[in-house]
């Protein structure tokens, strides 16, 4: 940060209520993925303090399947993931 300030540059790191506001980043991610992943209702942290959401899928996915779906749906050239033998049903969103 000091180097940015010394060079008269600013940095914006937006991990704020913009993630959880109605119609904002998490909502857009959920809307893009809910049909493809058969997502149920979204839930936030129990005490309301977190910026992430979770949703249960009506289906199970392997890590490879989920990465492929995310890559295509979000238009990402690369999606990094860790292989696992456990099926994935709970999806976390944090814009």
Residue ranges of model-derived segments:
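Hydrophobic structural segments
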Residues: 1-95
């Amino acid at each position: 940060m000091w180097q940015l300030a010394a060079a008269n540059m600013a940095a914006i790191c937006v991990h704020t209520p913009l993630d959880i506001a109605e119609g904002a980043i998490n909502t857009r991610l959920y809307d893009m993925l809910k049909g493809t992943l058969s997502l149920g209702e979204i839930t936030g942290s129990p005490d309301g303090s977190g910026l992430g959401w979770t949703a249960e899928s009506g289906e199970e996915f392997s890590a490879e399947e989920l990465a492929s779906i995310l890559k295509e749906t979000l238009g990402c050239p690369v999606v990094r993931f860790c292989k696992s033998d456990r099926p994935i049903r709970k999806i976390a969103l944090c814009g």
